Amino acid sequence: MKKLLYVTGSRAEYGIMKRLLHTISADHDIELSIVATGMHCDKNYGLTYKIIENDGFIIDRLIDIKLSAENNSYIINSMSICLNEFGNYLEENKFDAILLLGDRYEIYSVAIAAAFHNIPIIHLHGGEQTLGNYDEFIRHSITKMAKLHLASTETYRQRIIQMGEAPDTVFNIGSLGAENSLLLDLSTKKELESIYGSLKKPYFV
């Protein structure tokens, strides 16, 4: 049985991953562990790790990194706490691979810890662009540390390959978020009108 770790730092990124995590947890050949950090552990964001638990997952550990984006020094402090905590956690717990999505700075620290512990990183949504933001260089840095790349479009797959990654490690799997939206159970017009009244009245979105 392979031991897979998934680290989540925000509700938004977890929401994209939730359906995939249920699929992985149902696979008898994979032992899935989940660690929540970042926004999930911050009361200012509603302690959103509880959402993960309410979805039926067991969280192996909560790692509070004293999240703050007040200024760059606070961000660097949070990153250093995260790097130290995950460095210790990954020393104590041996995993065959670690699953990471995106480009937040706490995920960057997790990736560095995993890379130095020689734990293969499976990175989702690499190759994308967010010009003028930290996300840009963080995402590409994680790409260079990852061993398996799951891109959301062919354009992003090609960009990862252009960065020097072996083509046989880069796959276009599509967008999990877009796929999730196609599976939403949308209300009918009649159901909406039973809640909000006539939809013929003027409205704005």
Stretches found by the model and what they are:
Residues 3-5, 31-35, 122, 148, ...:
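A structural signal for isolated positions on well-ordered beta-strands in alpha/beta enzyme cores
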Residues 63, 124, 173:
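Hydrophobic residues at beta-strand termini and immediately following loops
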